[in-house]
């Protein structure tokens, strides 16, 4: 049984400048500790000459794996503020690396916390957050005479339609949210006078966009 969770919608990168220091925050959805570490290493290779590359990531629906590093910044001023951005927005299966190129002016503990946290927050906002909601795949097959009305009903009800196959009959491949199955099945039965076939498929995730909240 799949469980709902939040994650980052896509990879993104932003740049902020704070008192001549440049902060580059890059965020990416990841599925495992290994993928997260590979992403962190990739950023380190790109920004090998940077003063600091500060990583943070959370893996697992229940936040089973949490890791961050200050990478030489004063303890608690860099990695933890980045991690807290993910936690505050309940985002998992995501990794962030905030790269700093020192500009010659010290920011102080408070300034570092604001800069690293702010860069991570802007990266998350740019990438976007999605709710990963359990959904049910289904294939609905009807005669051509009913195809137009069935398709119109699917569209009018905002049912997620992943594909249509035109063979001897028409097959609509849909992705159903919890609670949609029985009502839709009854509707198709009424439209076709029970002349349809319904095949349930896998339970999968459907991504629903959200905005970063904190």
Where are these regions (language model features)?
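Short glycine-/aliphatic-rich beta-strand segments at the starts of folded cytosolic domains
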Residues: 128-146, 174
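Short amphipathic alpha-helices in soluble, non-transmembrane regions
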Residues: 150-155, 183-192
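Active-site beta-strand/loop microenvironment that shapes enzyme catalytic pockets
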Residues: 78-126
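Terminal, non-globular segments
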Residues: 174-183
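A common structural junction motif
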Residues: 47-50, 157-162, 189-197
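Short amphipathic alpha-helix segments
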Residues: 141-159
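Interdomain boundary/hinge elements
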Residues: 53-55, 129-137, 164-169, 197-202
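C-terminal regulatory domains involved in ligand/effector binding and gene-expression control
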Residues: 1-76, 181, 197-214
């Amino acid at each position: 049984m799949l469980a709902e969770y939040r994650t980052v919608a896509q990879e993104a990168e932003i740049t902020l400048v704070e008192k001549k220091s440049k902060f580059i925050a890059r965020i990416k959805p990841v599925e495992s500790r290994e993928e997260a570490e590979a992403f962190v290493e990739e950023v380190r290779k790109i920004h090998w000459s940077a003063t600091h590359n500060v990583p943070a990531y959370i893996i697992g629906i229940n936040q089973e794996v949490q890791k961050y590093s200050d990478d030489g910044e004063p303890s608690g001023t860099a990695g933890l503020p980045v991690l807290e951005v993910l936690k505050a927005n309940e985002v998992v299966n995501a990794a962030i690396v905030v790269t700093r190129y020192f500009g010659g002016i010290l920011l102080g503990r408070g300034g570092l916390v604001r800069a690293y946290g702010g860069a991570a927050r802007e990266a998350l906002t740019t990438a976007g957050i999605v709710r990963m909601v359990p959904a049910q795949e289904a294939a609905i097959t009807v005669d051509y005479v009913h195809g137009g009305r069935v398709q119109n009903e699917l569209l009018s009800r905002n049912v997620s339609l992943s594909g249509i196959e035109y063979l001897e009959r028409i097959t609509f491949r849909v992705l159903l949210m919890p609670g949609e199955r029985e009502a839709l099945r009854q509707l198709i039965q009424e439209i076709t006078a029970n002349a349809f076939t319904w095949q349930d498929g896998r339970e999968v995730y459907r991504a629903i966009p959200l905005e970063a909240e904190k």
